Design a protein with these regions (language model features):
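Nucleotide/phosphate-binding site architecture used for ATP/NTP-dependent chemistry
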Residues: 1-233
């Protein structure tokens, strides 16, 4: 889609996609003259231009969006759906990739992009997350954009929209674990300092003490994420 406005803005989801591409490929260049731009050629007649806000020695580059599609007839601002489609189509032709594979990949990229924006819109506290020390759970819930070098860091397949809002850490949900009574012969694992039975018993005592009477030497309490529990049942 060609955009009617050229208002410059930060787009962290698009930035993750672009930084992953820059890290994994070499078919791009920096403009030799101001303004500072990253140029990705599409073919002999078209290229994508990205205004560089900061080019990082650690590859955490920042860009001002929208990107521009430059052709023989002019320069046009384009949205993320269009620029990601153009880049994926280019790679498909270059690498002879199957069309269905590329379509699935593009769909995941767009879902991740949309989810990132939904998360930021829903988390009204995101602007103050760096103003205080966070515990482990809070830190996990503060990862609103995901991996900085990933084309689809917030893809959440196979969750649907309702499940994503209920369970994904970036939505800051709270929910209880599902507990199962499992024969010890069906459980295998290791634990530091404690044996597996001791570790599971301690975890149950800390999180579901009301279930401790279900324990026996042969039946152990085993916790699962509620989505995993529903899936197995």
């Amino acid at each position: 889609m060609i955009l009617p406005s050229e208002k410059s803005a930060t787009d962290v989801a698009a930035q993750c996609f672009l930084n992953a591409l820059i890290r994994e490929t070499k078919d791009w260049q920096l403009a030799e003259y101001p303004p500072d731009e990253l140029i990705i050629p599409l073919d002999e007649q078209k290229s994508l231009h990205f205004r560089v806000a900061y080019f990082s020695p650690t590859q955490h580059h920042r860009f001002a969006f929208p990107a521009h599609l430059v052709t023989a007839s002019g320069s046009y601002p384009v949205d993320f759906t269009t620029l990601s489609r153009l880049i994926i189509d280019k790679l498909r032709h270059q690498l002879f990739l199957p069309v269905p594979l590329c379509e699935t990949f593009h769909q995941r990229v767009l879902e991740s992009y949309a989810h990132t924006q939904q998360t930021i819109d829903a988390r009204h506290d995101w602007a103050i997350l760096r103003e205080k020390a966070l515990n482990f759970g809070e830190a996990e819930q503060a990862l609103l954009t995901g991996h900085a070098f990933h084309p689809a860091p917030k893809s959440h397949e196979p969750f649907n929209r309702q499940e994503a809002e209920r369970y994904l850490p970036d939505m800051a949900p709270h929910f209880p674990l599902r507990w199962f009574s499992v024969d010890k012969t069906q459980i295998a694992g290791e634990s530091l300092h404690l044996n597996l039975q001791q570790r599971l018993t301690r975890f149950a005592a800390e999180n579901a003490p009301q279930l401790l009477n279900e324990l026996s030497d042969n039946q152990w309490l085993f916790p699962l994420h509620p989505w995993q529990g529903e899936y197995l049942l």
